[in-house]
Structures are given as C-alpha cells and as structure tokens.
From Swiss-Prot:
Membrane topology per record: Single-pass membrane protein
Natural source organism: Salmonella phage IKe
Protein name: Tail virion protein G7P
Recorded GO CC terms: host cell membrane; membrane; virion component
This protein's UniProt keywords: Host membrane, Membrane, Transmembrane, Transmembrane helix, Virion
Subcellular location: Virion; Host membrane
Family per similarity comment: Belongs to the inovirus G7P protein family.
Keyword presence, Methyltransferase: no
InterPro entries assigned: Inovirus_G7P_2 (IPR045539)
One Pfam family hit: Inovirus_G7P_2
Domain of life, source organism: Viruses
Transmembrane segments: 8-28
Main function: May initiate with G9P the virion concomitant assembly-budding process, by interacting with the packaging signal of the viral genome. The assembly-budding takes place at the host inner membrane. In turn, G7P and G9P are present at the end of the filamentous virion that emerges first from the bacterial host.
C-alpha cells in the first residue's frame, strides 16, 4: 500500500475532523 501526498493530506484532514469532534463532545460534556 503506497501512499501519495494526496492520501496523506486526506488522512490528516480526516484525523483533524475526528479530533475536533472529539474535543467538542468532551467540552460539551464538561460544561453540561
């Protein structure tokens, strides 16, 4: 499985969304 620069950018973008959603959920839970 060879990864091109586009694949890496897509993976980083996806991870960024997951992390941002995770932090948002944690923050909402803390301040609920």
């Amino acid at each position: 499985m060879s990864m091109t620069s586009d694949d890496i950018i897509y993976v980083v973008f996806a991870l960024g969304l997951v992390v941002s959603f995770g932090l948002g959920a944690i923050t909402a839970g803390v301040f609920r």
